[in-house]
Regions:
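Short beta-strand micro-motifs within the conserved protein kinase catalytic domain, predominantly
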Residues: 1-8
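Conserved short submotifs of the Hanks-type protein kinase catalytic core
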Residues: 9-20
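ATP-dependent phospho-/nucleotidyl transfer catalytic cores
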Residues: 20-121, 133, 227-241
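Hydrophobic HxD+1 residue recognition
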Residues: 124
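Catalytic-loop signature of eukaryotic-like protein kinases
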Residues: 127-130
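Pre-DFG segment of protein kinase catalytic domains
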Residues: 139-142
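Active-site activation/catalytic loop segments of kinase-like enzymes and analogous catalytic loops
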Residues: 145-187, 203-226
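All-alpha amphipathic helical-bundle segments outside canonical DNA-binding/catalytic cores
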Residues: 188-204
């Protein structure tokens, strides 16, 4: 049995964010707020882009195993996930769910191998963001899934979970251009915009693997159910641009 004497001295440091507004993923956001968030994300990615990305670290997940982990999860949950997704995704979205059974691992492994590596937040979404009174991003929280991988994964994850499904793809392209411009401003000069567009579409497919475990989760209160339903609706809208 431990006593107070067995516990080493420690300090818990908390930032006071009471004057900031927490993002709300169920409510979503408009393109202007999304652009602010993506600008901050670009600066994070640029700080660890390519050769500057740490190769090892006890504080983040090894990105090399991520594709296989999520594909294994998909295979284990495939049948129940397909039933769950069939109630929430369009015919095009379901075609992708079924297609990744054969092609998914190769496509997401290729994305991880070919795209420049950076430090990924891993859960970059509105519920983990705080905004200041002037609209700027005040803080990003929940850093427990930090890993190495293509920056497009964080980008696709945020966009697919934040923007209303009726958002035109031209607006999505503008947001991607804004993110890319912030990367360039921060010093990333070897990543063409056309490459980002391609990586973004592949990243959406990887997110299908990631979402295949959602039907196993306990959603809790009404907000949890609303979050999942809204997330799938928005994600399905973004999948429409991705060819089979």
């Amino acid at each position: 049995m431990q006593t107070d004497a067995d516990v080493p001295p420690c300090i818990l440091l908390l930032e006071d964010l009471h004057e900031s507004e927490m993002g709300n993923q169920v409510a979503g956001c408009d393109p202007a707020r999304a652009a602010i968030a993506l600008g901050a994300l670009a600066r994070l990615h640029a700080s660890g882009w390519g050769d500057a990305c740490p190769q090892m670290g006890h504080w983040f997940i090894n990105g090399d195993i991520v594709p296989r982990l999520f594909h294994a999860q998909y295979r284990n949950n495939r049948r129940s996930f397909e039933r769950f997704a069939a109630e929430r995704l369009s015919e095009h979205g379901m075609a992708h769910v079924k297609a990744i059974r054969k092609t998914g691992l190769a496509r997401i492994t290729r994305l991880h191998d070919a795209a420049p590596r950076t430090i990924l937040h891993g859960d970059f979404r509105l519920d983990n963001l705080f905004f200041a009174a002037d609209g700027s991003l005040a803080a990003i929280i929940d850093w427990q899934t930090v890993n190495r991988g293509p920056g497009a994964l964080d980008v696709a994850y945020f966009i697919a979970g934040s923007l209303p499904p009726e958002t035109p793809e031209a607006v999505i392209d503008d947001l991607l251009s804004s993110y890319h411009g912030a990367l360039v401003t921060a010093g990333v000069v070897d990543y063409p915009f056309e490459r980002l567009l391609a990586d973004y579409e592949e990243a959406l497919l990887l997110l299908l693997h990631r979402m295949s475990g959602l039907d196993q989760l306990e959603f809790g209160d009404d907000r949890g159910v609303a979050l999942m339903d809204t997330w799938f609706e928005r994600f399905d809208a973004r999948l429409q641009r991705v060819p089979l």
